[in-house]
């Protein structure tokens, strides 16, 4: 959600900023802008729309060796040129970009900016104007910046230019991700490592309530008291080629195809020298010894948690609750005496989940983060971390992170079961390998998935997904995939709930997708399909081999039914992809959505 890039060095700042912002497009945005500094001053270019639109307005003749850039996802003020970043102070001395939400911007405006006319509706402009007011009152830029930061309530990642000191970028962070990349004759600032890989893979992580003074040959980190902080740098595990589409038309299709490889990598990563599945002993003990586990997630991660709940309860015999992070913060349930909290987040930066983590840590409870990004905020602040090893996921619609979360939760449940002396009844390593092969076979049947999308979703405005047991949890994920990238109103329902209200929405031609992978509910879900078909629905049954009937539209390869969610979701991902494609939608960057939701 939003992105920041900054550069100061010897190269063309404009192009580095624009390329960096392109690497942050996956985070979601509605406008973009850059500010570059040279001997003539600070030049600001911004535009509503895509980075391609911004490129059209950037003056190619302006040469600069330093700059800051931003992609905006509207929180305060509509998407517009005036609300796009960078923002400048009234006298034009300061230029600033900001990610996050300043909760007390109205109070700051009333207290410090009574005589300043604001040009935008944003909370961000208030920050840059307050800085200038403090400088006008006699403070040096660094001190004015620090004083302003101490006043801010909320989340922020900020990069600031001073027109009187154009060889320096002032940076600060609180509850919004920001990294500083290191080079021999340059330094860069970015919301995540993907934006800086074009020039460096070495970076320093910033902690909350820290500020940084960045020049082309120096990075000085300070706390808000002005004390200098020394911190070791990291080498990013990513390679620039990891974040390219290659021959694929869209990242979503590429990432769907990568799922079998991710499954095999998870198997390999979580095997010990004897080929047995393993996680660090303290994590296994935390799961096995908990009297109740609370899985916290948002969107797709929440859906993965629903599947993980079944594994942990069925195999490890530990009760589990799954909660939407944004609701948990305000409606915390009565907690057990020895809980363990598991946080699912692809990015490790989800603000709603982090808010819950802060709450439960304050209560003294243990927390495990399962994430795709090492060193992310949720990873750093939890007691334990398990990594998904899925590689960068760029498309807004999650595919491989979802199946990776399910696989890692399965591994965790299996290890906890073993620690509790429970035999789960099958070889999970072998069955995950079979599931990976099945996923690969499904990825090779794209023509069939495209045909189903054309047949059922070409003119549809609504669609329903029904299932029972584990299939129901996959249905809610399939519905989310369809609605978020094709803009078709789609909902997933438990098959038995149809008669309690939802069936009233069924009319002639309504597409209804049904999953049938669980033997104990196979007859029941087929009965539900007959109910909606009798009312005119256009039904599509996707069944598991061995449970299939002659009239089923598509049959999945045979896998262990417990792991069917890893396999049954792949057709739903591809059907959603082709439905969006045929409707002319932006598959990788759907409207109004952000990949990494870093504000509550």
UniProtKB/Swiss-Prot annotation:
Its EC number is 2.6.1.16. It is an enzyme of class 2 (transferase). Keywords: Aminotransferase, Cytoplasm, Glutamine amidotransferase, Repeat, Transferase. It comes from the Bacteria. GO terms for molecular function: carbohydrate derivative binding; glutamine-fructose-6-phosphate transaminase (isomerizing) activity. Induction: Constitutively expressed, part of the cdaA-cdaR-glmM-glmS operon. One of its GO terms (biological process) is fructose 6-phosphate metabolic process. The keyword Zinc-finger does not apply. The active site is at 2 (nucleophile), 595 (for fru-6p isomerization activity). It comes from Bacillus subtilis (strain 168). Residues 283-422, 452-590 form the SIS domain. This is Glutamine--fructose-6-phosphate aminotransferase [isomerizing]. The keyword Thylakoid does not apply. It is found in: Cytoplasm. Residues 2-217 form the Glutamine amidotransferase type-2 domain. Homodimer. GO terms for cellular component: cytosol. InterPro entries: GATase_2_dom, GFAT, GFAT_N, GlmS/AgaS_SIS, GlmS/FrlB_SIS, Ntn_hydrolases_N, SIS_dom, SIS_dom_sf. The lineage of its organism: Bacteria, Bacillati, Bacillota, Bacilli, Bacillales. Catalyzes the first step in hexosamine metabolism, converting fructose-6P into glucosamine-6P using glutamine as a nitrogen source. It catalyses: D-fructose 6-phosphate + L-glutamine = D-glucosamine 6-phosphate + L-glutamate.
């Amino acid at each position: 959600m939003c992105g920041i890039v900054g550069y100061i060095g010897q190269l063309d700042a404009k192009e580095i900023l624009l390329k960096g912002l392109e690497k942050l497009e996956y985070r979601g945005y509605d406008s973009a802008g850059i500010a570059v500094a040279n001997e003539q001053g600070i030049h600001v270019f911004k535009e509503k729309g895509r980075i391609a639109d911004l490129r059209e307005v950037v003056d190619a003749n302006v040469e600069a060796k330093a700059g800051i850039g931003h992609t905006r996802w509207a929180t305060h003020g509509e998407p517009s040129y005036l609300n796009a970043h960078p923002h400048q102070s009234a006298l034009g001395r300061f230029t600033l970009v900001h990610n996050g939400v300043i909760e007390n911007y109205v109070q700051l405006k009333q207290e410090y900016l009574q005589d300043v006319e604001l040009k935008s509706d944003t909370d961000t402009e208030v920050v840059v104007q307050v800085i200038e007011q403090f400088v006008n009152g006699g403070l040096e830029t660094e001190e004015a910046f620090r004083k302003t930061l101490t006043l801010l309530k909320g989340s922020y990642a900020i990069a600031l230019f001073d027109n009187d000191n154009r060889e320096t970028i002032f940076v600060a962070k609180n509850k919004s991700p920001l990294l500083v990349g290191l080079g021999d004759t340059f330094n860069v600032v970015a919301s995540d490592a993907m934006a800086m890989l074009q020039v460096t893979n070495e970076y320093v992580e910033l902690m909350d309530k820290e500020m940084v003074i960045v020049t082309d040959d120096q990075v000085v980190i300070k706390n808000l008291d002005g004390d200098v902080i020394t911190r070791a740098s990291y080498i990013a595990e990513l390679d620039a080629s990891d974040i390219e589409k290659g021959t694929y038309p869209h990242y979503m299709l590429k990432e769907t195809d990568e799922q079998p490889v991710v499954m095999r990598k998870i198997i390999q990563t979580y095997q010990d020298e004897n080929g047995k599945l393993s996680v660090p002993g303290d994590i296994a003990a935390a799961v096995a010894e908990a009297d109740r586990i609370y899985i916290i997630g948002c969107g797709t991660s929440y859906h993965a948690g629903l599947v993980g709940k079944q594994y942990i309860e069925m195999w490890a015999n530990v009760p589990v609750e799954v909660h939407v992070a944004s609701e948990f913060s305000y409606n915390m349930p009565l907690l057990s005496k020895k809980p363990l909290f598991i946080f699912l987040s692809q990015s490790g930066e989800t603000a709603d989940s982090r808010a819950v983590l802060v709450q439960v840590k304050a209560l003294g409870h243990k927390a495990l983060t399962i994430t795709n990004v090492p060193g992310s905020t949720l990873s750093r602040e939890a007691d334990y971390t398990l990594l998904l090893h899925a590689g960068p996921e760029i498309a807004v619609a999650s595919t491989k992170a979802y199946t990776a979360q399910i696989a890692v939760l399965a591994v965790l449940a299996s290890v906890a079961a073993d620690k509790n002396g429970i035999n789960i009844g099958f070889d999970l390593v072998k069955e995950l390998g079979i599931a990976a092969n099945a996923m690969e076979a499904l990825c090779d049947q794209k023509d069939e998935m495209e045909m189903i999308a054309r047949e059922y979703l070409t003119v549809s405005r609504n669609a329903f997904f029904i299932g029972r047991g584990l299939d129901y949890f996959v249905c809610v994920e399939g519905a989310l995939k369809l609605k978020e990238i094709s803009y078709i109103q789609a909902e997933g329902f438990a098959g038995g709930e149809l008669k309690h209200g939802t069936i009233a929405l069924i009319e002639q031609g309504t597409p209804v997708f049904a999953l049938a992978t669980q033997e104990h509910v196979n007859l029941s879900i087929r009965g539900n399909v007959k109910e909606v078909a009798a009312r005119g629905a256009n039904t599509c049954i996707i069944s598991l081999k061995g449970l299939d009937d002659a009239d089923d539209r598509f049959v999945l390869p045979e896998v262990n039914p417990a792991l069917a969610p890893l396999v049954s979701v792949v057709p739903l991902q591809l059907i959603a992809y082709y439905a969006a494609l045929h409707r002319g939608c932006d598959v990788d960057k759907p409207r109004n959505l952000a990949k990494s939701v870093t504000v509550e």
